[in-house]
């Protein structure tokens, strides 16, 4: 493509990868050859994540562009080659990925991604040192989108679906999310909702927490995961189905 989708001069840490991927512009053969010995151009974690997303897309018949994978731009063509075959450009990833990860509100990006991005891959960033806990990078990669830190919101439109064996890559599905609404306990300013979630990957079992502000005695919050949600400190629970998450349905908690 032209403009900022055209190949730019990369930094030296990307040269080997892009040299191997350059052939995609004229045919997939040279790209495939470059990926055969994947250790030369991509990490095992990247390969593992790409293969998992590819299998998921095949199993669920996810069409393109709903199958588009947003990742670090230097690996973006690898993911999309495996997953959907649309690997000619990394321009969109280069424009949006870092801005998204280092913003403080993942769900504000949902409208941008809704018809453009199906999956987001996060990665370990040890070389950057301290990363604010409020960033999307930390919320997704370290906490699977859960509001486990009381003053930092979780996410309602990014569902954790996979973690690699070493935990270096996490995969999130962009979803409409289900909205839970209902009456709040008396004299409560915020309601805490919790569901137990398990995804493929070692140790990938976690409590998915969302917090909702109470207005006029009621609360409303969007959740990215299906499951049984425990409401506040009492015995109240609500079931959120897979369909509700995928279709953006509202689930009402009875009073």
What is each PLM-predicted segment?
Residues 3-255:
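Extracytoplasmic
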């Amino acid at each position: 493509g032209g403009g900022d989708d055209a190949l730019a001069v990369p930094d030296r840490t990307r040269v080997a990868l892009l040299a191997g991927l350059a052939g995609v512009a004229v045919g997939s053969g040279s790209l495939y050859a470059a990926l055969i010995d994947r250790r030369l151009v991509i990490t095992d974690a990247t390969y593992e994540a790409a293969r998992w997303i590819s299998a998921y897309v095949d199993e669920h018949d996810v069409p393109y562009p709903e199958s588009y994978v947003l990742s670090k731009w230097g690996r973006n063509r690898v993911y999309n080659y495996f997953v959907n075959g649309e690997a000619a450009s990394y321009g969109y990833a280069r424009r949006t990925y870092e801005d998204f990860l280092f913003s403080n509100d993942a769900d504000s990006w949902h409208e941008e991604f809704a018809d453009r991005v199906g999956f987001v891959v996060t990665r370990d960033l040890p070389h950057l040192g301290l990363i604010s806990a409020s960033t999307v990078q930390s919320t997704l990669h370290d906490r699977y989108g859960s509001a486990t830190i009381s003053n930092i919101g979780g996410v309602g439109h990014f569902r954790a679906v996979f973690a690699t064996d070493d935990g270096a890559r996490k995969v999130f599905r962009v979803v409409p999310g289900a909205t839970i609404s209902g009456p709040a306990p008396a004299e409560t300013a915020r309601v805490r909702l919790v569901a137990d979630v398990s995804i493929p990957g070692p140790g990938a079992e976690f409590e998915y927490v969302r917090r909702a502000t109470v207005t006029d005695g009621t609360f409303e919050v969007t959740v990215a995961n299906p499951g049984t949600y425990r409401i506040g400190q009492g015995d109240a629970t609500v079931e959120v189905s897979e369909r509700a998450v995928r279709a953006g349905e509202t689930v009402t908690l009875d009073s």
